Amino acid sequence: MPAYRSRTTTHGRNMAGARALWRATGMKEGDFGKPIIAIANSFTQFVPGHVHLKDLGQLVAREIEKAGGVAKEFHTIAVDDGIAMGHSGMLYSLPSREIIADSVEYMVNAHCADALVCISNCDKITPGMLMAAMRLNIPAVFISGGPMEAGKVKIRGKSVSLDLVDAIVAAVDPAESDADVMAYERSACPTCGSCSGMFTANSMNCLTEALGLALPGNGSLLATHADRKELFLEAGRLIVALAKRYYEQDDETVLPRSIANFGAFENAMSLDIAMGGSTNTVLHLLAAAQEGGVDFTMADIDRLSRKVPNLCKVAPATPEYHMEDVHRAGGVISILGELDRAGLIHRQMATVHSPTLGAALDQWDIVRSSYEAAQSRYLAAPGGVPTQVAFSQGNRWESLDLDRAQGCIRDIAHAYSKDGGLAVLYGNLAKDGCIVKTAGVDPSILIFSGPARLFESQEAAIAAILGDKIQPGDVVLIRYEGPKGGPGMQEMLYPTSYLKSKGLGEVCALITDGRFSGGTSGLSIGHVSPEAAEGGTIGLVEEGDRIEIDIPHRRIHLAVDEEELAQRQRAMEAKAQQAWRPVNRNRTVSLALQAYAALTTSAAKGAVRDLGQLNRS
């Protein structure tokens, strides 16, 4: 029977000093011996997805205490990728994931907490906390802040739903007036919550449901809706029950590594492929799997992408649907339900809230179940009022979206495509693979070739796009922006958005060893591995080289013969210390980022730390 970890600091005469300090935090005599539950909150006023979280940690804490636990809250950092986008701030986004994971580990282990509630929401916060939970392997429950409501605006007499990406594209579209751009800006992000499309934040919060670590509705129930409060309260009750099952009943099935095992990672990736989630999820799932000792790789993602269909298209893949529409159609559980009916998921996986995923689907899938709580939960609708306050409205849809032929979520027979919404491509340009969000690619350019237009920074590519130097048919190639080369593997939302605004979104490709925002659509291929800074072929491409892309056959090829590539490699390596470095880039890299670059691995491995290098040092 495992002992409560917290007894290290709460029991025995020699721990009088530690108990004195615990008493100074508010603990009473009767609290020593109860499970101490750490609440990792990520409240910040910098991020709209987190501005409403300030009091929610204490909401969970009170519920923990009612259930017989002791709650102790702490906070992590949180970077807003949208605000950090398009300038040097983006260098810090991915590295912040590791800082978050470390900070959660530090706080939980330093204070010997028994269990963990993770209050996350936006892009790197959920992955960082997930990595920490897998690393710590103590009972854990995830509860996110919830999605933002979609914006609503009237442009040229027509009412449209919109999101952040629409505002970015409109800002550089010469056809849009200043007044219309201002209307987009003021309407794109109307409430608190994670941006309203199937971007990285919402994708990751959906995946925590599929992994079995979050409650039904976590990924799709709006931040503003009163029903979301119950998820926070339930998380507080649940974590105490899980802690007691582990420490008092020796039930290891409640631990993150027992729940989020290989089968659960397959379920999560299958969900991601089916819903056309952000390409960043590949990076984060690979990282979390490594933290938990799960042998889940790019090869597994490639295999799943060939058999799981695309059942859901949400912004940015289509302007028609946002997260509030996914929720009305039954959320993550209903997408998993459709995959279940096709035999494409593992039903027997455990979850924090149900004995198995199959049992959860039978209860919460609105197509198969008449469970009143499920029917009610998925009727939660947007309020349509700008606010930064959580749980501030109680609007309900008049009906659920059960149309699996033409609705937001499709069944297998009516899938958008038999191949899923994400694909792994291989070839001489990406020997270890690269990722494309096929759900956002126009069918006319699934097979594409063109001359490489070469850039060694995101900034240079943006200048060329806005300067009308990119032509239809070009392949914009941005290199030295990978985990080591950037460093930090910048997101390329602005280049892809500007291509769209210039009318080039369906006639050009963009390839990079960097990554893309969840808001990216178009023929955008990222995570090229090995990256240029690691000696990848992408570092040998020259201006005008022909690049061939064949998504149906999962192929990406640099049309340069092997002898020429070998000669280029010899010339590169002759540069000694200047080899595999950008030639004409002036970028200040801080000591913190240099340390990140020194330890990080390839995107094909999730850009986690290189344990081999650590072991050698």
UniProtKB/Swiss-Prot annotation:
Residues with N6-carboxylysine modification: 124
Pathway: Amino-acid biosynthesis; L-isoleucine biosynthesis; L-isoleucine from 2-oxobutanoate: step 3/4; Amino-acid biosynthesis; L-valine biosynthesis; L-valine from pyruvate: step 3/4
GO biological process, one term: isoleucine biosynthetic process
Documented EC number(s): 4.2.1.9
Keywords: 2Fe-2S, Amino-acid biosynthesis, Branched-chain amino acid biosynthesis, Iron, Iron-sulfur, Lyase, Magnesium, Metal-binding
Annotated positions binding [2Fe-2S] cluster: 122, 195
Active site positions, chain numbering: 517
Molecular function terms from GO: 2 iron, 2 sulfur cluster binding; dihydroxy-acid dehydratase activity; magnesium ion binding
Residues that bind Mg(2+): 81, 123-124, 491
Top EC class of this enzyme: lyase
Cofactor binding annotation: Binds 1 [2Fe-2S] cluster per subunit. This cluster acts as a Lewis acid cofactor.
HAMAP family the record matches: IlvD (MF_00012)
Stated role: Functions in the biosynthesis of branched-chain amino acids. Catalyzes the dehydration of (2R,3R)-2,3-dihydroxy-3-methylpentanoate (2,3-dihydroxy-3-methylvalerate) into 2-oxo-3-methylpentanoate (2-oxo-3-methylvalerate) and of (2R)-2,3-dihydroxy-3-methylbutanoate (2,3-dihydroxyisovalerate) into 2-oxo-3-methylbutanoate (2-oxoisovalerate), the penultimate precursor to L-isoleucine and L-valine, respectively.
Subunit structure, interactors included: Homodimer.
Protein name: Dihydroxy-acid dehydratase
Organism encoding this protein: Nitrosococcus oceani (strain ATCC 19707 / BCRC 17464 / JCM 30415 / NCIMB 11848 / C-107)
